[in-house]
Amino acid sequence: MAKSMRTIKNPFFTSHPPSPFFHLSLLFFTPLKKSSPRYLNHHHQTRCPPPQFFLLLISLSLVFSGISFLTFSLDTGSSTCVSTSSASSLKFFISDVDHRQILTSLAVSGASTLFPLPARGGHSGNMTEEEKEFWKQPNGEGYKPCLDFSLEYKKKSASVSKEKKRFLVVVVSGGLNQQRNQIVDAVVIAMILEAALVVPVLQVNRVWGDESEFSDLFDVEHFKKTLRSDVRIVSSLPSTHLMSRQTIENQIPWDVSPVWIRAKYFKQLNEEGLLVLKGLDSKLAKNLPPDLQKLRCKVAFHALRFAAPIENLGNKLTRRMWIEGPYIALHLRLEKDVWVRTGCLTGLGSEFDRIIAETRTSQPRYLTGRLNLTYTERRLAGFCPLNVYEIARLLKALGAPSNASIYIAGGEPFGGSRALEPLAKEFSNLVTKETLAHKGELLPYTNRSSALAAIDYIVSLSSDVFIPSHGGNMAKAMQGNRAYVGHRKFIMPNKRAMLPLMENSSVSDAELSFLTRKLHRKSQGYPESRRGRRDRDVIAYPVPECMCRHRKHRSVGFF
Protein backbone atom coordinates (compact mmCIF):
# COMPACT_ATOMS: atom_id res chain seq x y z
CA MET A 1 0.00 0.00 0.00
CA ALA A 2 2.80 2.38 0.90
CA LYS A 3 4.37 1.82 -2.47
CA SER A 4 1.19 2.70 -4.32
CA MET A 5 0.81 5.85 -2.26
CA ARG A 6 4.22 7.10 -3.31
CA THR A 7 3.35 6.45 -6.92
CA ILE A 8 0.17 8.44 -6.55
CA LYS A 9 2.00 11.39 -5.03
CA ASN A 10 4.59 11.50 -7.82
CA PRO A 11 3.89 14.81 -9.61
CA PHE A 12 5.05 13.37 -12.93
CA PHE A 13 2.39 10.67 -12.96
CA THR A 14 -0.10 12.04 -15.46
CA SER A 15 -2.79 9.42 -15.94
CA HIS A 16 -6.15 9.87 -14.25
CA PRO A 17 -7.89 7.27 -12.10
CA PRO A 18 -11.02 5.70 -13.53
CA SER A 19 -14.19 7.33 -12.28
CA PRO A 20 -16.90 5.43 -10.40
CA PHE A 21 -18.98 5.55 -13.59
CA PHE A 22 -16.24 3.74 -15.49
CA HIS A 23 -16.41 0.83 -13.06
CA LEU A 24 -20.21 0.82 -13.29
CA SER A 25 -20.07 0.74 -17.05
CA LEU A 26 -17.71 -2.23 -16.91
CA LEU A 27 -20.11 -3.99 -14.57
CA PHE A 28 -23.17 -3.56 -16.78
CA PHE A 29 -21.81 -3.36 -20.32
CA THR A 30 -18.97 -5.88 -20.46
CA PRO A 31 -19.00 -7.89 -23.71
CA LEU A 32 -19.94 -11.57 -23.51
CA LYS A 33 -16.84 -13.73 -23.32
CA LYS A 34 -16.55 -16.63 -25.74
CA SER A 35 -14.79 -19.74 -24.63
CA SER A 36 -13.60 -20.63 -28.12
CA PRO A 37 -10.60 -18.78 -29.63
CA ARG A 38 -12.33 -18.58 -33.00
CA TYR A 39 -14.54 -15.81 -31.72
CA LEU A 40 -11.55 -13.52 -31.16
CA ASN A 41 -11.42 -12.55 -34.82
CA HIS A 42 -15.04 -11.52 -34.96
CA HIS A 43 -16.95 -8.53 -33.61
CA HIS A 44 -17.90 -8.83 -29.96
CA GLN A 45 -21.54 -9.35 -29.27
CA THR A 46 -22.79 -7.33 -26.32
CA ARG A 47 -25.68 -8.22 -24.15
CA CYS A 48 -28.39 -5.66 -23.52
CA PRO A 49 -28.96 -5.26 -19.80
CA PRO A 50 -32.48 -5.65 -18.49
CA PRO A 51 -34.38 -2.53 -17.28
CA GLN A 52 -33.61 -3.15 -13.61
CA PHE A 53 -29.92 -2.72 -14.35
CA PHE A 54 -30.62 0.76 -15.71
CA LEU A 55 -32.61 1.62 -12.59
CA LEU A 56 -29.76 0.41 -10.40
CA LEU A 57 -27.23 2.37 -12.45
CA ILE A 58 -29.29 5.56 -12.09
CA SER A 59 -29.60 5.03 -8.33
CA LEU A 60 -25.89 4.50 -7.92
CA SER A 61 -25.09 7.51 -10.08
CA LEU A 62 -27.13 9.68 -7.72
CA VAL A 63 -25.04 8.41 -4.81
CA PHE A 64 -21.81 9.27 -6.59
CA SER A 65 -23.01 12.60 -7.95
CA GLY A 66 -22.13 14.37 -4.69
CA ILE A 67 -18.52 13.22 -4.70
CA SER A 68 -15.96 15.36 -6.55
CA PHE A 69 -12.57 13.93 -7.35
CA LEU A 70 -9.66 16.27 -7.67
CA THR A 71 -8.10 15.88 -11.12
CA PHE A 72 -4.56 16.76 -11.86
CA SER A 73 -2.32 16.68 -14.88
CA LEU A 74 1.28 17.77 -14.94
CA ASP A 75 3.40 17.75 -18.05
CA THR A 76 6.83 16.56 -16.92
CA GLY A 77 8.39 19.76 -18.05
CA SER A 78 5.77 22.36 -18.03
CA SER A 79 2.12 22.15 -17.26
CA THR A 80 0.02 21.73 -14.15
CA CYS A 81 -3.73 22.06 -13.97
CA VAL A 82 -5.51 21.12 -10.76
CA SER A 83 -9.12 20.92 -9.73
CA THR A 84 -9.61 21.65 -6.04
CA SER A 85 -13.08 20.42 -5.19
CA SER A 86 -13.68 20.18 -1.48
CA ALA A 87 -15.17 16.68 -1.65
CA SER A 88 -17.24 17.58 1.37
CA SER A 89 -19.53 14.61 0.77
CA LEU A 90 -16.67 12.35 1.89
CA LYS A 91 -16.26 14.08 5.23
CA PHE A 92 -18.45 11.72 7.24
CA PHE A 93 -16.31 8.70 6.33
CA ILE A 94 -12.79 10.06 6.68
CA SER A 95 -12.36 9.49 10.41
CA ASP A 96 -11.99 5.75 9.83
CA VAL A 97 -9.54 5.98 6.94
CA ASP A 98 -5.80 6.53 6.90
CA HIS A 99 -4.83 10.04 5.84
CA ARG A 100 -2.74 8.80 2.94
CA GLN A 101 -5.77 6.91 1.59
CA ILE A 102 -7.74 10.14 1.81
CA LEU A 103 -5.09 11.99 -0.14
CA THR A 104 -5.10 9.22 -2.74
CA SER A 105 -8.84 9.54 -3.35
CA LEU A 106 -8.82 13.33 -3.30
CA ALA A 107 -5.52 14.29 -4.90
CA VAL A 108 -4.36 12.31 -7.87
CA SER A 109 -0.58 12.29 -8.45
CA GLY A 110 0.22 14.90 -5.84
CA ALA A 111 -1.82 17.95 -6.82
CA SER A 112 0.25 19.78 -4.29
CA THR A 113 2.77 18.67 -1.72
CA LEU A 114 0.19 19.12 1.04
CA PHE A 115 -3.52 18.74 0.42
CA PRO A 116 -5.85 19.45 3.35
CA LEU A 117 -8.73 17.40 4.61
CA PRO A 118 -12.12 18.77 3.48
CA ALA A 119 -13.44 21.83 5.29
CA ARG A 120 -16.14 20.79 7.74
CA GLY A 121 -18.11 23.97 8.29
CA GLY A 122 -20.34 24.41 11.31
CA HIS A 123 -23.53 22.56 12.13
CA SER A 124 -26.80 24.32 11.56
CA GLY A 125 -28.35 23.46 14.91
CA ASN A 126 -28.25 26.11 17.64
CA MET A 127 -25.88 28.40 15.74
CA THR A 128 -26.28 32.12 15.22
CA GLU A 129 -26.03 33.67 11.78
CA GLU A 130 -22.70 35.20 12.81
CA GLU A 131 -21.34 31.77 13.75
CA LYS A 132 -22.52 30.27 10.48
CA GLU A 133 -20.87 33.10 8.59
CA PHE A 134 -17.66 32.58 10.53
CA TRP A 135 -17.34 28.95 9.36
CA LYS A 136 -18.38 29.61 5.78
CA GLN A 137 -15.64 29.12 3.20
CA PRO A 138 -14.83 31.84 0.63
CA ASN A 139 -15.78 31.61 -3.02
CA GLY A 140 -12.73 30.46 -4.96
CA GLU A 141 -14.25 31.90 -8.16
CA GLY A 142 -13.15 28.87 -10.16
CA TYR A 143 -9.41 29.42 -9.73
CA LYS A 144 -7.27 26.31 -9.83
CA PRO A 145 -3.51 25.70 -9.98
CA CYS A 146 -2.28 25.94 -13.54
CA LEU A 147 1.44 25.97 -14.31
CA ASP A 148 1.83 26.38 -18.07
CA PHE A 149 5.45 27.10 -18.90
CA SER A 150 6.40 28.76 -22.18
CA LEU A 151 8.15 26.96 -25.04
CA GLU A 152 11.24 29.10 -24.41
CA TYR A 153 11.34 27.96 -20.78
CA LYS A 154 10.95 24.31 -21.78
CA LYS A 155 13.89 24.57 -24.17
CA LYS A 156 16.09 26.25 -21.57
CA SER A 157 15.13 23.87 -18.76
CA ALA A 158 15.86 20.88 -20.99
CA SER A 159 19.47 22.05 -21.04
CA VAL A 160 19.71 23.21 -17.40
CA SER A 161 18.31 19.92 -16.12
CA LYS A 162 21.36 18.15 -17.60
CA GLU A 163 23.99 20.69 -16.43
CA LYS A 164 27.24 19.09 -15.17
CA LYS A 165 29.79 21.94 -15.25
CA ARG A 166 28.27 24.79 -13.22
CA PHE A 167 27.18 24.18 -9.63
CA LEU A 168 25.36 26.45 -7.18
CA VAL A 169 25.61 25.97 -3.41
CA VAL A 170 23.18 27.95 -1.24
CA VAL A 171 23.30 28.33 2.55
CA VAL A 172 19.87 29.13 4.00
CA SER A 173 19.09 30.48 7.45
CA GLY A 174 16.27 31.40 9.81
CA GLY A 175 13.16 29.50 10.85
CA LEU A 176 11.31 26.93 8.77
CA ASN A 177 9.39 29.31 6.53
CA GLN A 178 12.40 31.58 6.00
CA GLN A 179 14.29 28.48 4.93
CA ARG A 180 11.50 27.48 2.56
CA ASN A 181 11.51 30.92 0.94
CA GLN A 182 15.27 30.79 0.40
CA ILE A 183 15.12 27.27 -1.01
CA VAL A 184 12.49 28.43 -3.50
CA ASP A 185 14.71 31.33 -4.55
CA ALA A 186 17.75 29.04 -4.74
CA VAL A 187 16.04 26.91 -7.39
CA VAL A 188 15.04 30.02 -9.34
CA ILE A 189 18.58 31.43 -9.18
CA ALA A 190 19.97 28.08 -10.37
CA MET A 191 17.66 28.34 -13.38
CA ILE A 192 18.72 31.95 -14.03
CA LEU A 193 22.42 30.97 -13.89
CA GLU A 194 21.87 27.71 -15.79
CA ALA A 195 23.54 25.78 -12.98
CA ALA A 196 23.00 22.51 -11.18
CA LEU A 197 21.86 23.04 -7.59
CA VAL A 198 23.41 21.21 -4.66
CA VAL A 199 20.78 20.33 -2.04
CA PRO A 200 20.68 23.52 0.08
CA VAL A 201 22.70 23.70 3.30
CA LEU A 202 20.71 24.68 6.42
CA GLN A 203 22.62 26.98 8.74
CA VAL A 204 22.29 26.32 12.48
CA ASN A 205 19.54 28.58 13.82
CA ARG A 206 21.15 31.09 16.18
CA VAL A 207 17.94 31.69 18.14
CA TRP A 208 16.79 28.10 18.75
CA GLY A 209 20.01 26.17 18.11
CA ASP A 210 18.28 23.85 15.62
CA GLU A 211 20.88 21.74 13.79
CA SER A 212 18.46 20.09 11.35
CA GLU A 213 19.71 19.31 7.85
CA PHE A 214 17.66 19.47 4.65
CA SER A 215 16.92 15.74 4.74
CA ASP A 216 15.68 16.01 8.33
CA LEU A 217 12.92 18.39 7.25
CA PHE A 218 12.20 17.65 3.60
CA ASP A 219 11.89 14.65 1.30
CA VAL A 220 15.11 14.96 -0.73
CA GLU A 221 14.22 12.42 -3.41
CA HIS A 222 10.82 13.99 -3.96
CA PHE A 223 12.49 17.41 -4.23
CA LYS A 224 14.87 16.14 -6.91
CA LYS A 225 12.23 14.18 -8.77
CA THR A 226 9.68 16.98 -8.91
CA LEU A 227 12.22 19.43 -10.32
CA ARG A 228 14.12 17.03 -12.57
CA SER A 229 12.69 18.65 -15.71
CA ASP A 230 13.59 22.16 -14.50
CA VAL A 231 16.92 22.14 -12.67
CA ARG A 232 19.43 19.38 -12.00
CA ILE A 233 19.68 18.84 -8.25
CA VAL A 234 22.52 16.84 -6.70
CA SER A 235 23.12 15.74 -3.13
CA SER A 236 26.76 16.84 -3.08
CA LEU A 237 29.44 18.43 -5.22
CA PRO A 238 31.39 16.17 -7.57
CA SER A 239 35.05 15.64 -6.64
CA THR A 240 36.11 17.76 -9.63
CA HIS A 241 34.54 20.84 -8.02
CA LEU A 242 35.77 20.45 -4.45
CA MET A 243 38.02 23.32 -3.39
CA SER A 244 40.09 23.91 -0.26
CA ARG A 245 38.81 27.48 -0.02
CA GLN A 246 35.82 28.99 -1.74
CA THR A 247 34.61 32.58 -1.58
CA ILE A 248 31.10 32.90 -0.14
CA GLU A 249 29.00 35.60 -1.76
CA ASN A 250 26.85 37.13 0.98
CA GLN A 251 26.65 40.80 0.01
CA ILE A 252 23.49 40.57 -2.05
CA PRO A 253 21.36 43.74 -2.22
CA TRP A 254 17.58 43.74 -1.85
CA ASP A 255 15.18 43.20 -4.73
CA VAL A 256 17.70 41.97 -7.31
CA SER A 257 16.47 41.04 -10.78
CA PRO A 258 17.42 38.05 -12.97
CA VAL A 259 19.44 40.47 -15.13
CA TRP A 260 21.43 41.57 -12.07
CA ILE A 261 22.01 37.96 -11.00
CA ARG A 262 23.41 36.97 -14.41
CA ALA A 263 25.54 40.09 -14.77
CA LYS A 264 27.02 39.62 -11.29
CA TYR A 265 27.64 35.89 -11.13
CA PHE A 266 27.40 34.13 -14.49
CA LYS A 267 30.94 34.86 -15.69
CA GLN A 268 32.45 33.85 -12.33
CA LEU A 269 30.37 30.67 -12.26
CA ASN A 270 31.32 29.83 -15.82
CA GLU A 271 35.03 30.22 -15.08
CA GLU A 272 35.19 28.57 -11.66
CA GLY A 273 32.35 26.08 -12.01
CA LEU A 274 31.14 26.79 -8.47
CA LEU A 275 29.25 29.60 -6.75
CA VAL A 276 28.36 29.70 -3.04
CA LEU A 277 25.58 32.09 -1.98
CA LYS A 278 24.52 33.00 1.54
CA GLY A 279 22.02 35.49 2.95
CA LEU A 280 19.32 35.07 0.30
CA ASP A 281 16.36 35.94 2.51
CA SER A 282 14.01 38.20 0.51
CA LYS A 283 16.86 39.32 -1.77
CA LEU A 284 15.45 38.10 -5.08
CA ALA A 285 12.85 40.44 -6.57
CA LYS A 286 9.17 39.62 -6.04
CA ASN A 287 8.45 40.67 -9.62
CA LEU A 288 9.90 38.09 -11.99
CA PRO A 289 9.05 36.88 -15.52
CA PRO A 290 5.97 34.60 -15.55
CA ASP A 291 7.93 31.37 -16.04
CA LEU A 292 10.09 32.04 -13.00
CA GLN A 293 7.00 32.87 -10.93
CA LYS A 294 5.51 29.53 -11.93
CA LEU A 295 8.76 27.84 -10.98
CA ARG A 296 8.49 29.46 -7.55
CA CYS A 297 5.04 27.94 -7.13
CA LYS A 298 6.21 24.55 -8.35
CA VAL A 299 8.98 24.49 -5.76
CA ALA A 300 6.87 25.82 -2.88
CA PHE A 301 3.67 23.85 -3.47
CA HIS A 302 4.93 20.69 -5.19
CA ALA A 303 8.62 20.03 -4.56
CA LEU A 304 9.04 20.92 -0.88
CA ARG A 305 7.36 17.97 0.76
CA PHE A 306 8.12 17.40 4.42
CA ALA A 307 10.15 14.34 5.39
CA ALA A 308 7.99 11.23 5.91
CA PRO A 309 8.26 11.07 9.75
CA ILE A 310 7.20 14.72 10.06
CA GLU A 311 4.44 14.35 7.50
CA ASN A 312 3.09 11.19 9.15
CA LEU A 313 2.97 12.74 12.61
CA GLY A 314 1.47 15.95 11.24
CA ASN A 315 -1.23 13.94 9.51
CA LYS A 316 -1.99 12.01 12.72
CA LEU A 317 -2.46 15.21 14.69
CA THR A 318 -4.55 16.66 11.88
CA ARG A 319 -6.91 13.68 11.98
CA ARG A 320 -7.29 14.04 15.74
CA MET A 321 -8.34 17.67 15.32
CA TRP A 322 -10.50 17.10 12.24
CA ILE A 323 -12.42 14.16 13.70
CA GLU A 324 -13.88 16.42 16.41
CA GLY A 325 -15.39 18.84 13.89
CA PRO A 326 -14.42 22.18 12.38
CA TYR A 327 -11.49 23.94 13.98
CA ILE A 328 -9.60 27.22 13.96
CA ALA A 329 -5.82 27.42 13.68
CA LEU A 330 -4.22 30.44 15.35
CA HIS A 331 -0.61 31.26 14.68
CA LEU A 332 0.34 33.16 17.80
CA ARG A 333 3.62 35.09 17.90
CA LEU A 334 4.09 35.16 21.66
CA GLU A 335 7.68 33.94 21.91
CA LYS A 336 10.19 35.97 23.90
CA ASP A 337 12.35 36.79 20.87
CA VAL A 338 9.30 38.22 19.06
CA TRP A 339 8.56 40.68 21.86
CA VAL A 340 12.24 41.63 21.99
CA ARG A 341 12.56 42.17 18.23
CA THR A 342 9.32 44.09 17.71
CA GLY A 343 9.79 46.51 20.60
CA CYS A 344 6.28 45.72 21.86
CA LEU A 345 4.76 44.96 25.26
CA THR A 346 3.46 41.51 26.13
CA GLY A 347 0.19 42.50 27.79
CA LEU A 348 1.11 40.19 30.71
CA GLY A 349 1.97 42.91 33.18
CA SER A 350 4.93 45.02 34.29
CA GLU A 351 6.99 42.07 35.54
CA PHE A 352 7.13 40.44 32.10
CA ASP A 353 7.51 43.74 30.27
CA ARG A 354 10.54 44.57 32.44
CA ILE A 355 12.24 41.30 31.44
CA ILE A 356 11.67 42.08 27.76
CA ALA A 357 12.96 45.64 28.17
CA GLU A 358 16.13 44.43 29.90
CA THR A 359 16.79 41.83 27.21
CA ARG A 360 16.25 44.43 24.51
CA THR A 361 18.71 46.80 26.19
CA SER A 362 21.37 44.11 26.53
CA GLN A 363 20.87 42.82 22.97
CA PRO A 364 19.95 45.85 20.83
CA ARG A 365 20.93 44.06 17.62
CA TYR A 366 17.71 42.03 17.79
CA LEU A 367 15.44 45.10 17.70
CA THR A 368 13.90 45.66 14.28
CA GLY A 369 13.57 49.03 12.52
CA ARG A 370 11.53 52.14 13.33
CA LEU A 371 13.55 52.82 16.47
CA ASN A 372 12.03 56.29 16.82
CA LEU A 373 8.52 54.94 17.48
CA THR A 374 7.09 54.49 20.96
CA TYR A 375 5.34 51.26 21.93
CA THR A 376 1.91 52.88 21.49
CA GLU A 377 2.85 54.20 18.06
CA ARG A 378 4.17 50.79 17.03
CA ARG A 379 1.03 49.05 18.23
CA LEU A 380 -1.44 51.41 16.56
CA ALA A 381 0.59 51.28 13.34
CA GLY A 382 0.10 47.50 13.29
CA PHE A 383 3.75 46.60 13.95
CA CYS A 384 3.03 44.58 17.12
CA PRO A 385 1.64 41.04 17.32
CA LEU A 386 -1.85 40.83 18.78
CA ASN A 387 -1.67 39.70 22.38
CA VAL A 388 -4.04 37.06 23.75
CA TYR A 389 -6.57 39.62 25.03
CA GLU A 390 -6.83 41.15 21.58
CA ILE A 391 -7.01 37.76 19.86
CA ALA A 392 -9.86 36.68 22.17
CA ARG A 393 -11.82 39.87 21.45
CA LEU A 394 -11.18 39.51 17.72
CA LEU A 395 -12.48 35.93 17.65
CA LYS A 396 -15.62 36.87 19.58
CA ALA A 397 -16.24 39.87 17.34
CA LEU A 398 -15.84 37.75 14.19
CA GLY A 399 -18.51 35.33 15.43
CA ALA A 400 -16.37 32.37 16.50
CA PRO A 401 -18.41 30.07 18.80
CA SER A 402 -17.14 29.92 22.38
CA ASN A 403 -17.01 26.11 22.12
CA ALA A 404 -14.92 26.16 18.93
CA SER A 405 -11.86 23.92 18.82
CA ILE A 406 -8.74 26.06 18.45
CA TYR A 407 -5.32 24.75 17.48
CA ILE A 408 -2.50 26.99 18.72
CA ALA A 409 0.47 27.02 16.33
CA GLY A 410 3.74 28.65 17.28
CA GLY A 411 6.62 28.34 19.69
CA GLU A 412 6.56 28.35 23.48
CA PRO A 413 4.80 31.57 24.56
CA PHE A 414 6.70 33.91 26.84
CA GLY A 415 5.03 33.54 30.22
CA GLY A 416 4.15 29.87 29.66
CA SER A 417 0.56 28.77 30.29
CA ARG A 418 -0.21 32.11 31.92
CA ALA A 419 0.16 33.76 28.52
CA LEU A 420 -2.84 31.82 27.17
CA GLU A 421 -5.15 32.26 30.17
CA PRO A 422 -7.14 35.23 28.76
CA LEU A 423 -7.83 33.25 25.59
CA ALA A 424 -8.68 30.04 27.47
CA LYS A 425 -11.17 31.99 29.59
CA GLU A 426 -13.24 32.81 26.49
CA PHE A 427 -12.50 29.68 24.44
CA SER A 428 -12.02 26.57 26.54
CA ASN A 429 -11.17 24.12 23.75
CA LEU A 430 -7.56 25.18 23.19
CA VAL A 431 -5.20 22.56 21.79
CA THR A 432 -1.47 22.56 21.02
CA LYS A 433 0.70 19.94 19.37
CA GLU A 434 1.98 19.08 22.85
CA THR A 435 -1.51 18.35 24.22
CA LEU A 436 -2.67 16.68 21.00
CA ALA A 437 0.28 14.31 20.64
CA HIS A 438 0.42 10.98 22.46
CA LYS A 439 3.21 10.21 24.88
CA GLY A 440 6.57 10.04 23.13
CA GLU A 441 5.36 11.18 19.70
CA LEU A 442 7.13 14.54 19.90
CA LEU A 443 10.23 13.15 21.59
CA PRO A 444 12.24 12.85 18.32
CA TYR A 445 11.77 16.58 17.76
CA THR A 446 13.10 17.89 21.06
CA ASN A 447 15.12 21.06 20.36
CA ARG A 448 14.15 20.86 16.69
CA SER A 449 12.08 23.98 16.22
CA SER A 450 11.84 23.70 12.43
CA ALA A 451 10.35 20.20 12.60
CA LEU A 452 7.83 21.37 15.21
CA ALA A 453 6.97 24.33 12.97
CA ALA A 454 6.42 21.89 10.09
CA ILE A 455 3.95 19.92 12.23
CA ASP A 456 2.13 23.17 13.02
CA TYR A 457 2.06 23.92 9.30
CA ILE A 458 0.45 20.58 8.42
CA VAL A 459 -2.25 20.83 11.10
CA SER A 460 -2.95 24.48 10.28
CA LEU A 461 -3.43 23.81 6.58
CA SER A 462 -6.46 21.57 7.23
CA SER A 463 -8.13 24.01 9.62
CA ASP A 464 -11.44 25.54 8.56
CA VAL A 465 -10.19 29.00 9.52
CA PHE A 466 -6.62 30.24 9.86
CA ILE A 467 -5.78 33.49 11.67
CA PRO A 468 -2.25 34.80 12.35
CA SER A 469 -1.67 37.21 15.21
CA HIS A 470 1.07 38.90 13.21
CA GLY A 471 2.36 39.00 9.65
CA GLY A 472 5.49 37.11 8.73
CA ASN A 473 6.71 34.11 6.80
CA MET A 474 4.27 31.57 8.30
CA ALA A 475 1.31 33.83 7.58
CA LYS A 476 2.40 34.41 3.97
CA ALA A 477 3.13 30.74 3.38
CA MET A 478 -0.22 29.67 4.81
CA GLN A 479 -2.08 32.36 2.87
CA GLY A 480 -0.62 31.16 -0.42
CA ASN A 481 -0.90 27.44 0.28
CA ARG A 482 -4.52 27.73 1.41
CA ALA A 483 -5.26 29.67 -1.77
CA TYR A 484 -3.48 27.08 -3.90
CA VAL A 485 -5.51 24.16 -2.53
CA GLY A 486 -8.89 25.82 -3.03
CA HIS A 487 -8.95 29.18 -1.20
CA ARG A 488 -9.51 28.00 2.36
CA LYS A 489 -10.60 30.68 4.80
CA PHE A 490 -7.71 32.91 5.86
CA ILE A 491 -8.31 36.01 7.98
CA MET A 492 -5.52 38.57 8.26
CA PRO A 493 -6.36 40.88 11.19
CA ASN A 494 -6.63 44.55 10.24
CA LYS A 495 -4.77 45.74 13.32
CA ARG A 496 -4.57 49.40 12.37
CA ALA A 497 -8.34 49.69 12.02
CA MET A 498 -9.58 47.39 14.78
CA LEU A 499 -7.31 48.30 17.73
CA PRO A 500 -8.69 51.87 18.06
CA LEU A 501 -12.20 50.36 18.08
CA MET A 502 -11.24 47.95 20.86
CA GLU A 503 -9.85 50.79 22.95
CA ASN A 504 -12.92 52.99 22.47
CA SER A 505 -15.05 52.42 25.58
CA SER A 506 -18.08 53.98 23.88
CA VAL A 507 -18.21 51.12 21.34
CA SER A 508 -20.49 48.34 22.60
CA ASP A 509 -19.75 44.65 22.06
CA ALA A 510 -22.51 44.45 19.44
CA GLU A 511 -21.10 47.45 17.58
CA LEU A 512 -17.58 46.08 17.82
CA SER A 513 -18.74 42.78 16.35
CA PHE A 514 -20.54 44.49 13.47
CA LEU A 515 -17.63 46.82 12.68
CA THR A 516 -15.00 44.07 13.01
CA ARG A 517 -16.86 41.76 10.63
CA LYS A 518 -17.28 44.66 8.21
CA LEU A 519 -13.54 45.45 8.41
CA HIS A 520 -12.63 41.86 7.55
CA ARG A 521 -15.33 41.19 4.97
CA LYS A 522 -12.81 41.23 2.12
CA SER A 523 -10.10 39.50 4.12
CA GLN A 524 -11.51 35.98 4.12
CA GLY A 525 -9.15 34.18 1.76
CA TYR A 526 -10.86 35.18 -1.48
CA PRO A 527 -8.72 35.15 -4.64
CA GLU A 528 -6.53 38.26 -4.71
CA SER A 529 -4.51 39.14 -7.77
CA ARG A 530 -0.83 39.91 -7.42
CA ARG A 531 -0.98 41.90 -10.63
CA GLY A 532 -0.07 45.56 -10.20
CA ARG A 533 1.45 45.01 -6.73
CA ARG A 534 5.23 44.74 -7.03
CA ASP A 535 5.64 44.03 -3.32
CA ARG A 536 3.40 40.95 -3.34
CA ASP A 537 5.08 37.56 -3.29
CA VAL A 538 3.61 34.99 -5.67
CA ILE A 539 3.97 32.39 -2.89
CA ALA A 540 1.37 34.36 -0.90
CA TYR A 541 -0.65 35.51 -3.94
CA PRO A 542 -0.56 32.74 -6.57
CA VAL A 543 -3.21 34.45 -8.76
CA PRO A 544 -2.77 35.00 -11.70
CA GLU A 545 0.67 33.51 -12.48
CA CYS A 546 0.07 30.12 -10.85
CA MET A 547 -3.72 29.82 -10.81
CA CYS A 548 -6.18 30.02 -13.69
CA ARG A 549 -9.94 30.44 -13.77
CA HIS A 550 -11.33 27.48 -15.69
CA ARG A 551 -15.02 27.99 -15.31
CA LYS A 552 -17.43 29.92 -13.14
CA HIS A 553 -18.01 28.35 -9.75
CA ARG A 554 -20.74 29.35 -7.41
CA SER A 555 -20.01 29.64 -3.71
CA VAL A 556 -20.63 26.41 -1.83
CA GLY A 557 -22.38 26.96 1.47
CA PHE A 558 -22.43 24.54 4.38
CA PHE A 559 -25.92 25.25 5.62
UniProtKB/Swiss-Prot annotation:
The chain crosses the membrane at residues 53-73. Its main location: membrane. It is a single-pass type II membrane protein. It comes from the Eukaryota. The keyword Transmembrane helix applies. GO terms for cellular component: membrane. Belongs to the glycosyltransferase GT106 family. Keywords: Carbohydrate metabolism, Fucose metabolism, Glycoprotein, Glycosyltransferase, Membrane, Signal-anchor, Transferase, Transmembrane, Transmembrane helix. Glycans are attached at residues 126, 372, 403, 447, 504. One of its GO terms (biological process) is fucose metabolic process. PANTHER family: O-FUCOSYLTRANSFERASE 37 (PTHR31741:SF63), OS02G0726500 PROTEIN-RELATED (PTHR31741). Substrate binds at residues 331-333. One of its GO terms (molecular function) is glycosyltransferase activity. Pfam families: O-FucT. This is O-fucosyltransferase 37. Its EC number is 2.4.1.-. Pathway: Glycan metabolism. InterPro entries: FucosylTrfase_pln, GDP-Fuc_O-FucTrfase. It is found in: Membrane. It is an enzyme of class 2 (transferase). The lineage of its organism: Eukaryota, Viridiplantae, Streptophyta, Embryophyta, Tracheophyta. The keyword DNA damage does not apply.
